[in-house]
Regions:
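Basic, Lys/Arg- and aromatic-enriched nucleic-acid-binding interface segment
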Residues: 1-47, 97
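Short, polar N-cap/turn motifs at the start of nucleic acid-interacting alpha helices
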Residues: 57-64, 126-127, 147-167, 174, ...
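C-terminal secondary-structure termini that scaffold catalytic or DNA-interacting sites
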Residues: 183-224
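C-terminal catalytic core of Y-nucleophile DNA break-rejoin enzymes
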Residues: 6, 73-92, 98-118
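Short, charged phosphate-coordinating catalytic segments
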Residues: 15-16, 40-64, 151
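Short basic/aromatic active-site micro-motif
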Residues: 32-34, 107-110, 126-146, 159
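C-terminal catalytic core of tyrosine-transesterase DNA break-rejoin enzymes
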Residues: 38, 42, 48-49, 118, ...
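Catalytic-site neighborhood detector that most strongly recognizes the C-terminal catalytic loop/helix
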Residues: 3, 11, 72-76, 109, ...
Length: 224
């Protein structure tokens, strides 16, 4: 049996993503491509599903929130994704530009890749941009780093197995640090070390071996 080697997928870190968001790009084509990429980062939707997204896929809930309901082209899995402020702004920005009821005009993959390469260079990101990377960034940067459970991420990304989601969602050092801060707050004052009679000077003076011999001698005396 051949052992599977885990794949280390790249996702944008917070600094890279902020550079991308705030960049003033020189042409409409680059701005449009950047916005499609950002939409993917905030929704986890890949290029193929983005191209097929229509107004009928946008559902308004009773509380007024808007959601994307789609079946992924690749797996046919149902995905329900809440639209946050930035993707809602992007939809409004490009309203009416898509054909046949589609939300967006999405260029061919080769043209997108060419534009993404230029954007990455102009923003000094130090990495290549792809829509696979956008999905990884959705799982890690947008969801997991902000406390969204991996089961929920898996459902939104249209995965049938959480193991697949684990490939996309990577635990960052920032996430670990924040989780441990929460753990520290939640356990503060809940536990106490009992007084076992061991003098603290034993450890301060490094005289543990001598203290241990005293205890053993005392135990032997009690047994006699």
């Amino acid at each position: 049996k051949i052992e599977k080697v885990p794949v280390n997928h790249r996702h944008l870190n917070r600094e890279q993503f902020e550079k991308l968001l705030n960049a003033r790009l020189p042409t409409y084509r680059l701005c449009h491509t950047r916005d499609l990429f950002v939409f993917s980062v905030f929704t986890g939707i890949g290029r193929a599903d983005l191209a097929n997204l229509t107004e009928d896929n946008i559902i308004t809930k009773e509380d007024g929130s808007k959601w994307i309901h789609i079946a992924r082209q690749k797996t046919k899995a149902e995905c329900h994704i809440k639209l946050l402020d930035i993707p809602l702004c992007i939809i409004e920005k490009y309203k009416g530009e898509g054909k046949d009821g589609r939300l967006f005009y999405v260029p061919q993959t080769c043209n997108l890749c060419r534009s993404l390469k230029i954007i990455a260079e102009q923003c000094n990101l130090g990495c290549h941009l792809t829509f696979y990377q956008a999905r990884h960034s959705f799982a890690t940067l947008i969801c997991l780093s902000n406390g969204v459970p991996i089961e929920t991420i898996s459902k939104m990304m249209g995965h049938y197995s959480i193991r697949t989601t684990q490939i996309y969602a990577e635990i960052t050092n920032h996430k670990v640090s924040r989780d441990l801060e929460t753990l520290s707050e939640n356990t503060k004052g809940k536990y106490a070390l009992p007084d076992d009679g061991m003098p603290s000077r034993v450890f301060k003076c490094g005289n543990y071996s001598g203290w241990k011999k005293k205890c053993e001698s005392s135990d032997r005396t009690k047994m006699k």
